[in-house]
Amino acid sequence: MSKKFTMTLLSSSLAGLLVMSGGVSAQEEKYTVPYAIGEGKWGNTYEVVKTGGNGNFRYEVKEKNGKKRSLFTFDSKGDVIINGSGITYTIHDGALNDFAQTAEKKKNGQSQSHRMTDSVVRDVYNKVYSLQRTKITGFSVEDGENGKVSLGSDAKASGEFSVAVGTGARADKKFATAVGSWAAADGKQSTALGVGAYAYANASTAAGTAAYVDGSAIYGTAIGNYAKVDENATEGTALGAKATVTNKNSVALGANSVTTRDNEVYIGYKTGTESDKTYGTRVLGGLSDGTRNSDAATVGQLNRKVGGVYDDVKARITVESEKQKKYTDQKTSEVNEKVEARTTVGVDSDGKLTRAEGATKTIAVNDGLVALSGRTDRIDYAVGAIDGRVTRNTQSIEKNSKAIAANTRTLQQHSARLDSQQRQINENHKEMKRAAAQSAALTGLFQPYSVGKFNATAAVGGYSDQQALAVGVGYRFNEQTAAKAGVAFSDGDASWNVGVNFEF
């Protein structure tokens, strides 16, 4: 005969059993366990009794042999509540929930089928038995309005509403949180996350191995392994491994970045020794065009501006060149006319030489030199003066041509530099898309929901033509507190985050 059983609700007409009734505090409705379905033979291994107190009904599973030892109690949702030293465990079983709902429907004459079997009872009891004997060391919860929580060897939460998690973790001030071995949150509302992270200032945050915020740097934030907000650097933010802020209201962005003055966002990074103080540079990509005087200008804006200057200069050079050419042609024509007028002479009817203008007959000057030898010196002087003017005009033309050539070379150099900057912008654009894809992937990671359990989660993300993979783990300490960490990878780059969740 099969050992399988099904809890079946019996009314007073089934198997001659009596349904007991009475007041809420004393009411017990018994449910029997048949040994085999449909044969009318009822076993005596288990008994399910519905008990009530203060209007809260539960189902208690007992062994019917001997003393009827109580195995466990579950509510109408199928939850088994186990209370330990400061810790409450909840076991939920769908079959128990199914049974409780079936019990309620039986009163209304509805179907009495359900899924609770003897194997379900044994499985739930084994879980209850194990949790009742589980001991968690290094865990402390102080009840009351100033409750504090500490978890880990030598962990200490001494501030009001403070939390210390990890070996040697310290949360000394009100609302302080320290998570990680030897992490210390020593300022009011301060948060220290990571091994050896120190948040000494009020309202400060230090996240990452050995991340540090000095006690005088109020509102300081240091995120990244060995990131540091130094003395008196109030409201400073160090983001990146070994990033350091030494100035007020300044931001050190990127690994090894170090600020140089107050109210500054600095992305350069330290490359030399302490005495050398050599700094490298980074490219800030993915920017919109600046619209205010205090905004940063993009290379695209500069390209358009330089292009406009180039077109304007080119147009001006063309106009000036045309003016110079017209002026030179005009002056040359005038000189030619004057020269021509002065290389002929008029001859009167009596053979006297006159000016060529208006003369009926003219002859070449050379022909008239025999008769006018006394005037040769004056004519030579006039011709020499004309030649000097022509020479000066020629020199002016050559000078303008050289200036045009120099301007052309300068424009070519600007064009080469702009091409180099455009290539750098394209590379930065790809890097920003990878960062966006990593951020999207990290956002897809789930945090843990079940108390006392770790979870492992993975997610993918993308932005434009870039993709990223993120993986993470988490742990829920209780219903109010959980922590998780994740890392994302994309084309050789990686980013990470660590978070802690408090629910009030």
Swiss-Prot record:
Extracellular side: 27-453
The keyword Signal belongs to this UniProt entry's keyword annotation: yes
Renumbered residue ranges of the record's region Neck: 281-296
InterPro entries in UniProt: Adhesin_Head_dom, Pilin-like, Serralysin-like_metalloprot_C, YadA_C
Region (Right-handed coiled-coil (RHcc)): 297-342
Record-linked Gene3D superfamilies: 6.10.250.1970, 6.10.250.1980, GSPII I/J protein-like, Serralysin-like metalloprotease, C-terminal
Membrane topology: Multi-pass membrane protein
Region listing for Head domain, in residue ranges: 154-280
Gene Ontology cellular-component terms listed: cell outer membrane; cell surface
Domain comment as written in the entry: The signal peptide, cleaved at the inner membrane, guides the autotransporter protein to the periplasmic space. Then, trimerization and insertion of the C-terminal translocator domain in the outer membrane forms a hydrophilic pore for the translocation of the passenger domain to the bacterial cell surface. Trimerizes to make a lollipop-shaped form which consists of three domains: a C-terminal membrane-anchor domain, an extended coiled-coil stalk domain which binds IgG Fc, and an N-terminal head domain.
Miscellaneous comment text of the record: Encoded in a prophage region of strain ECOR 9, upon UV treatment bacteriophage containing this gene can be isolated.
Family: Belongs to the autotransporter-2 (AT-2) (TC 1.B.40) family. Eib subfamily.
Name of the protein described by the UniProt record: Immunoglobulin-binding protein EibC
Gene: eibC
